[in-house]
C-alpha cells in the first residue's frame, strides 16, 4: 500500500534548496522523508523471515512477492522507485539485505523469480548512487546504524557471487552450429593484411593452447616441465601476435628455458 500511495521510503523526492544560495530572508532546510515507520516495519520483516524460512513456504512466497513489488529494475531517472534522500538509506539497504537473505536461504524454488529478484536488488542499490551526494540529516545514533546496515549489505553482496552457479552460464545445445556459421561469415569477409593477421594470430594461439594437450599425459613434476619446454621449443613466435590472457601486449619472444612469454 505504501508503495502505491508513495508514503515514507517510497515517497517522491522534494527538491531541496542549495545551502550556498541562502540569504538572510531565506534559510533553506533539509526535507528528509519520514521513514521511521518503514524502519520499524522492515525490522519486523527481517525478524519474521528468520522464522518463516524454516517452517512456512506460504510466508516465504509473501516475502518474495512483497520484495518484488517494492523494487524496480530502473536505475537513475527523475523518479526512482524509492526515495534517494540520504535519510532513507537505512531502510532501503535493510530491505535489500533482506532480499539477499531470501536468495541465500535457497527457499525460492523458481529460478526465474530468483534471477529477477536478484537483478532488482542490484538495480535498486545502484539507483541510490545515481543522484548527487548529500549531507546526512540523521542524528549520530541513526547515522551509525545506517552505516552499519550498508556494511552488512556490502558483506551480503560480496558473498552473493557464490550463488551464481555455473548452470546459469551453460549455453544452449544448438549454439555450436550458430557459432561456426558466425565464424565462417566473419572470416570469409577478411582479405589482404586483415586475413594474414587473423591466420597468424590464431595459428600462434592454437599452437600455444595445444601445449596443454601435449603435456597432459605426463605426471606433474619434472617430466611434465620437460615436456612443456619441448613442446614450446617447436612454437615459432609470429610478428604482431598476442595472447588472449593479455590482448593489449604483443608477444616479442618466448623464453624457451622457462616458457615465459616476453
From Swiss-Prot:
The lineage of its organism: Eukaryota, Metazoa, Chordata, Craniata, Vertebrata. Gene3D superfamilies: Phosphatidylinositol 3-kinase Catalytic Subunit, Chain A, domain 4. Belongs to the PI3/PI4-kinase family. Type III PI4K subfamily. Pfam families: PI4K_N. InterPro entries: PI4K_N (IPR045495). This is Putative inactive phosphatidylinositol 4-kinase alpha-like protein P1. Residues 180-262 are annotated as: Pleckstrin homology (PH) domain conferring phosphoinositide binding specificity. It comes from the Eukaryota.
Amino acid at each position: 500500500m505504501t508503495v502505491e500511495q508513495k508514503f515514507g521510503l517510497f515517497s517522491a523526492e522534494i527538491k531541496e534548496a542549495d545551502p550556498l544560495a541562502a540569504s538572510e530572508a531565506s534559510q533553506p532546510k533539509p526535507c528528509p522523508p519520514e521513514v521511521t515507520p518503514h524502519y520499524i516495519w522492515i525490522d519486523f520483516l527481517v525478524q519474521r523471515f528468520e522464522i518463516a524460512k524454516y517452517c512456512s513456504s506460504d510466508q516465504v512466497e509473501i516475502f518474495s512477492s512483497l520484495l518484488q513489488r517494492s523494487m524496480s529494475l530502473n536505475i537513475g531517472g527523475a523518479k526512482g522507485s524509492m526515495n534517494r534522500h540520504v535519510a532513507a538509506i537505512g531502510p532501503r539497504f535493510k530491505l535489500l539485505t533482506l532480499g539477499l537473505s531470501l536468495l541465500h536461504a535457497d527457499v525460492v524454488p523458481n529460478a526465474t523469480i530468483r534471477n529477477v529478484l536478484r537483478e532488482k536488488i542490484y538495480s535498486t542499490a545502484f539507483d541510490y548512487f545515481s543522484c548527487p551526494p548529500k549531507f546526512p540529516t540523521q542524528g549520530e545514533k541513526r547515522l551509525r546504524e545506517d552505516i552499519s546496515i550498508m556494511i552488512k549489505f556490502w558483506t551480503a553482496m560480496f558473498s552473493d557471487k557464490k550463488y551464481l552457479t555455473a548452470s546459469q552460464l551453460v549455453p544452449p545445445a544448438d549454439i555450436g552450429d550458430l557459432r561456426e556459421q558466425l565464424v565462417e561469415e566473419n572470416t570469409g569477409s577478411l582479405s589482404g593484411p586483415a586475413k594474414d593477421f587473423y591466420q597468424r594470430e590464431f595459428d600462434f594461439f592454437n599452437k600455444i593452447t595445444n601445449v596443454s594437450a601435449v603435456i597432459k599425459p605426463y605426471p606433474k613434476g619434472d617430466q611434465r616441465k620437460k615436456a612443456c619446454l619441448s613442446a614450446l621449443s617447436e612454437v615459432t613466435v609470429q610478428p604482431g601476435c598476442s595472447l588472449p590472457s593479455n590482448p593489449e601486449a604483443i608477444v616479442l619472444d618466448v623464453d624457451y628455458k622457462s616458457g615465459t612469454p616476453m
